[in-house]
Structures are given as C-alpha cells and as structure tokens.
Amino acid sequence: MSKTSQKSDKPEMEKKEQPSLLGPSLLGRSLLDRIAVRKGTFETILVPLLSVFTAFVVGSILIIFSHAETLAAWGNFFHDPWTAITISWQSIIDAYRALLTGAFGDPKQIGEAIKTWRTTGETKTLLDAFRPLSESLVFTTPYIFAGLGVAVGFRGGLFNIGAEGQLFVAGLASVFVGYAIKGLPWPLHMLLALLAGIAAAALWGFVPGILKARLGAHEVINTIMMNYIAFRLTDYLLTGPMIAGSGALPITPDIQRSAYLPALFPAPMRVHWGFFLALAMAALVYWFLWKTPLGMEIRMVGANPRAARYAGVRIAAITVLTMVLSASLAGMAGANQVLGVEHRLVRAFSSGYGFDAIALALLGNSHPFGVVISSLLFGFLRSGAARMQSVAGTPVELIRIIQGMVIVFIAAPEIIRSLYRIGRTKKKKAVAKAAAAD
C-alpha cells in the first residue's frame, strides 16, 4: 500500500470514529441527566409527603393512648387481642373522620344542602354546610402570607424567626389606620390600611437586616429580640393609647367598614378576599424569585454568598432587601387578620401563625407553591381539630404534636430516607462501583 493511499484512508477512518452530535453517547447522557433531575425532584417531593404520612402514623399511636377505653382494652390484650386491635382501629378512624369533617364539611350534609338549594333556592343550609371549608381557608390565608415570608428569607440565606413579631406590628398599624382615619371610600381606605401594615412590618424587618449586613449580627438573635419588643409594644398599646371604650378589655376599637377586606360569601362564612390575595402573592413571589434578575441575586446569595460576591452581587444590599421582603410578606398575615377576620386587634389575634410559618417554609421546600400546599394542610388541620375533640374525644393538642412531628421529619430528612430506604440502592451501587475500582 502506498503512502498516498494511507493518507487518504486516514481521514475516512477518523471521520467514522467521530460521534455525531445526535449520536447515542450524547443522547444517552442527556437522557440519564434528565432521569437524574427527575429522580431528584421526585425525592424532593416524596420526602415531605412521607414526613406528613409518618407524622399521622405517630398521631395514630397517640390517639390510641389518649382514650381510656382503648387503654383498658390493651390492658387485656393477652386475654382478648382482637378486641384491643378493633377498638384502637375504630378510635383512629373516628378521630381522623372527625378531623376531615371539621376541615371540609360533612359530605352527606353538603349533598342534602345542595339538593335543598336546587329545589327551594334556600341558601342558609348551603352556607352552613360549607362553613367548615370556609373556616379552613380562613386559617390557611395567614399561613400562606407568613410562610411566604419565611420562605423568601430561606431563599436568601436568612432565618427570619421574627415573623410573629412582624405580624403583630403590621396588625397594629393596619388596625390604627382602619379605625382612626374616617371618611375615606372603601377601596382607598382598605389599601391604605393594608399598606400601613406592610410598611410597619418592613421597618421591623429592616432593623435585623441592616444589623446583619453592617455589623454581622446574627438575624436569629435579632429577630427573636424584635419579637419580644413587638409583643410588649402590643401589650402597652392595647392597655393604653389604643384601648377601646371604657378600657375593661385589652382590645382596640373596631375598624371602619371602609377598611374591610370584603367577605366572599354571606355569614356565617368568613372567607374573604385575602385568600385570593395570598394566592396572588404566591404567584408574584415565584415570578420575582425565578424570573427577575433581582430574584436571581437573592437566590445566589442564599446558595453561595462567596460566589455571589465574586459575581458582583452587593451582598449587604441584598441581605437588607431580603429581610425587608420577608418581613413585609409576614406582615401581610397580620394585616389580613385585622382587616378581613377580626376587624379589631386583641392580644392573641395571631395564635402562632408566624412561628408555624417556619414549618410551612420547610415543608414546602421554600418554594411559593409548596408553601401554599403546606399552608392548606395546616389550615385544614387547625380547622378540623375542634371537631375532632368534640366528636371523637381526641385532645386538640394532638394537631400540634402532628405539626411538630412534621417539623422534626422535615428538619432531619435522613430519618425518613433511612426509614423508607430512599436512595439506598443508589448508595449501594456507588459503594460497589468504588469497591470494584479498588
């Protein structure tokens, strides 16, 4: 074979060996990458779901031990095991059935109310039948606002544990504008009261934000201290300058009707426009964090502050902005309560929404839509708890225990991964591959 023929054959051989852009290796790699991403997303969703399920399993065990009848049956377990198991199972079913009925309403009652409404046009029984669902949405609304606030902080690398205090000062500002200013028309007065609450909460979040950015003071300590200041400020104002009437009770005067967040349905249903405002804010937060340059900078700082600094992000400014946004969203929960539900402010108007928001953000993976879903769960639990206690005799504190167990399992996901063997196969394959390489 001549040299010229060897040279002419060489390019052809090289051309045959080069994989095409759509060759099986690149396609296979792309497919594997997509499968890996989807598997990671699936696990991200699966772990919170299993955390909730496991918390309810723990709750079921506590239900068994919270009834004297079941305890007596278990005392005779070795004599009559089937009775103990049957009574325990029935107590669990009764408790969770009452919980669901209290959260969504009685299906039979709803069906009869709809039938009556169709035949006679009478709406009272229909409204009564759907009242449990309405109450669940009333509880859900402040959860969404406060959960979004904590989630924004998490995305920016900040632990805003001061949502409860921010909620209180927002309620104070909104209720003051709501009752002190008179003569304004409805939309303007309502918006002014809502903005006053947001501004007060933003100011409350600015303080720990600037301390973190300028002095490096940890936001957890600062926000806890700001909580105490907010609580004591509320106590002072409710027993002094803002007290209503004769001063017999520590409450503010009722706000003007022009400052109300309007109800969606007639009484006794209390769900109001704030619920749809909360859903709109969730969509807005998603758009801001994932579709805008400023939102990307917040997520960059939260993911890797050093890399964000090298990329030219102003860390101090983003830190302050994140805390202000987080506090503003939490403050909307307080404004929502006084403008849409209570129409005045009392000492215990919050009932811990700001503290529960930490669990909501963790359960929702700090994603706005995840926060909405977890808020619905907590709202339904809180609404159904009273009926569970009155009908099934299960203590209402069980709901708090279930919520606490959800937090434990979310904060320590390895418990769930180990319990349900999530990711074990992948780890075993990696170990086997490393052993084979050695």
Language model feature labels by segment:
Residues S2-A55, S60-F65, Y310-A317, A385-D438:
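Cytosolic-side transmembrane-helix boundaries in multi-pass membrane proteins
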Residues R38-L46, F154-G162, G183-P250, W287-P293, ...:
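Short loop segments and helix-boundary regions at transmembrane helix junctions
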Residues V58-K115, P241-I251:
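Interfacial/capping segments of alpha-helical transmembrane domains
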Residues L62-A68, I93-A180, L194, I198, ...:
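Single transmembrane alpha-helix segments in multi-pass membrane proteins
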Residues A68-A73, F154-A170, A213-N222, E342-F355, ...:
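Short, non-helical or kinked segments that cap or interrupt transmembrane helices
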Residues A98, P107-I110, T223, N227-K291, ...:
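Transmembrane helix-bundle core of multi-pass membrane transporters
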Residues P268-R344, P368-F369:
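Helix-loop-helix "hairpin" substructures at the membrane interface of multi-pass membrane proteins
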Residues V324-G404:
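Transmembrane alpha-helical segments in multi-pass inner-membrane proteins
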